[in-house]
């Protein structure tokens, strides 16, 4: 039996927009809920309410691939020492109003047990499960969502740029409380993709702001108490910085450094992602899901992440049996042979995952550079084309990726109906002669060493920031790009860094260029086109100021007409109500994106996998974990140890 949640679902079509979708009905065994044995003593001592009281009236019911599991055990895994908060997000943080099913086929209920949408795709209504609770036992209601909306999202000090998930054509959503359990999201124009967006990426925003906890740090609610709090938190210069130090998006550091922050996640941190040698989480006693036998989830008691600096060390520790689960940074061709050979000694198996981004290695020049000379050159499409032709992609793939991959630009994968061959293949031919000829028209003068001079007569140098992440050997890739660029007169200086430092540079708009992978290889291109246009999402900052402008038209910088046309084309994708209309508009958008050619891709993605202990059950095979889908977090609650350790 495959993993499923036996409910009507909403696929990409919005033809059922007026239909109310119901969550799991209240089980017949509601009076006989069961809990993990580790909680028994707390309940007996009166330190914790009974499990039936902790659960909502209609908990979400999970159906498992291997059946009802067993309680107990600690899941051992690993995380990079710095800047790898995405690892935590993908493991324990994906609780949303609505959710994609694990096979990415349909959107269904989650925290909202019912939801409906208007026929014109402008109004969406959600009914929360009654009795939901934060991890500290306090009620989660519509008031928490309204706190996010009125006091965070619409507060220009806290949210100067509005998150695009909750805007249409630069205009923010209007959120209205109907009652304690019912909330309405209304847009000024059609937003046919809203449910899909809400189940993806940054759709967690409305449900991560506990009002009862965070209001103490908000000037509106505690103006008189803020000075004392600032004195106790000297690193925060004002109430805005103080508030932002207590909460953030789930893939940003503050979310994982504040142990006092209540959440709706299945596990809560007891050791933060900070200076310790490991990160530790224990079960949330108020988690709101059960299995078909009435057992409160999750099955596994706790999770530990060993903090390591080196992906190679991660792989070696996996083969020696020190981890029960791993997938980030080592699930690629670089480590596959070692990990395959180590399955017996490490007592683990390979599990297929569907992780197909738009490209595994993408050169992203900062089109909004604060250096006016570099900005002008980076924004010149012919410069980007010339640099693209200078790169010997096949040589990189052969030497760095042991032949796994194919030369390609940022593009939807060939297996998908939206595949655009022109977009995938344009400017990928290794042609240094053509590259040099194009560059001669842009920067004809050279210095004594053969490097090109900019219009001010200075050597044109690209400072390339490189973080060794995902196990994709980015430093090795950029060293080869550096050589190819030198052959056509472009000076690239490689600056190695870690992800945390790179994050800081992105948000300050300080980088010249960097290399990263790009989402959008499959259907997430509809909801997450961040590599195809300036779009305010995590990790992709090739045109941050333009993406800020796109989100609300009042911040950032107005882009050129060609980019504005690209943004307008995506607005049409968002507004489309039917599948056919949306599909055609997305094809139009991708054609415009190909015309703009904003980023330089190197290699089509390699097959991915994850490793799980042979002792782990209910592990879904072939799960998509691409982009901001945040898998495998939605299925981790059903994992269990066949022989849990005491």
Give the positions of each predicted feature.
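Extracellular/periplasmic solute-recognition and catalytic clefts
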Residues: 154-162, 175-177, 270-282, 306-372, ...
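N-terminal lobe/hinge region of extracytoplasmic solute-binding protein
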Residues: 41-44, 49-119, 150
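A structural "hinge/loop" feature
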Residues: 66-91, 111, 194-203, 364, ...
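Surface-exposed binding/hinge segments that line
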Residues: 164-246
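Ligand-site clamp/hinge motif
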Residues: 129, 253-258, 286-338, 478-482, ...
